[in-house]
Amino acid sequence: MAKVRTKDVMEQFHLELISGEEGINRPITMSDLSRPGIEIAGYFTYYPRERVQLLGKTELSFFDQLPEEDKKQRMKSLCTDVTPAIILSRDMPIPPELVEASEQNGVPVLRSPLKTTRLSSRLTNFLESRLAPTTAIHGVLVDIYGVGVLITGKSGVGKSETALELVKRGHRLVADDCVEIRQEDQDTLVGNAPDLIEHLLEIRGLGIINVMTLFGAGAVRSNKRITIVMDLELWEQGKQYDRLGLEEEKMKIIDTEITKLTIPVRPGRNLAVIIEVAAMNFRLKRMGLNAAEQFTNKLADVIEDGEQDE
């Protein structure tokens, strides 16, 4: 899991630092935010102190009505040694009790001009993206007709050469050799290339080429949601391969299962065209058009008609 610090959030959203500067390197370990309204009312039994605290007009207007002694005590309880930051929305005035408590405990107090709900959604999306579970897979990721296709297989089977042919046919390369994958949601996997090898493609006998330089900016993209895996393997004599496409194989990446197709490789097979058509067929299946099922139904009808004629 990637590390996010308060400083990263401050720079990403151009937040104004009010106090507690010594704590800007505190780690943020979860994407959930806290609106500490009930805590300001005095109930701290289940206070999620490890979350980023977000104060809006509702919380601060209630806080203004508290007695002076209660104000100091509530802010001291709000600013703990593990609280990453306290953020105020709408450029609202900062209570002096909050500034004092934040300086004592080193909790950064930040301010944003955004409305509370808008700031909350943006913060949550940013943290979920940065804190998502990640992994790396040896393969090639290509955007084919809007379908994110992860091409896997043993080294030397022809993944990069296939990707090069797909790029020449107008599709877009995302990553070659190493694909960094993060799970942004329960069923959403997004892949990208490591910074070091972004836009690069390695072809045996040719070396490393820069796809963006050779084919233009339209031939690459920085990231893509992965929707199907195509595993290339050398053709094994006697092994039974799927010839109808009725059964779907699944592959688990992190906690998400996605469709996997095994494509046998042998001389004379145009892998780029096969993968291209497989991506198009996958889109058709998602639209409810399954050629294999239609063929099976027609075959069953023909057999049934033949039995009736007898």
From Swiss-Prot:
A biological process from GO: regulation of carbohydrate metabolic process
Catalytic site: 138, 159, 177, 243
Record keywords: ATP-binding, Carbohydrate metabolism, Kinase, Magnesium, Metal-binding, Multifunctional enzyme, Nucleotide-binding, Serine/threonine-protein kinase, Transferase
Gene3D superfamilies: HprK N-terminal domain-like, P-loop containing nucleotide triphosphate hydrolases
Catalytic activity: [HPr protein]-L-serine + ATP = [HPr protein]-O-phospho-L-serine + ADP + H(+); [HPr protein]-O-phospho-L-serine + phosphate + H(+) = [HPr protein]-L-serine + diphosphate
Family label: Belongs to the HPrK/P family.
Name of the protein this chain belongs to: HPr kinase/phosphorylase
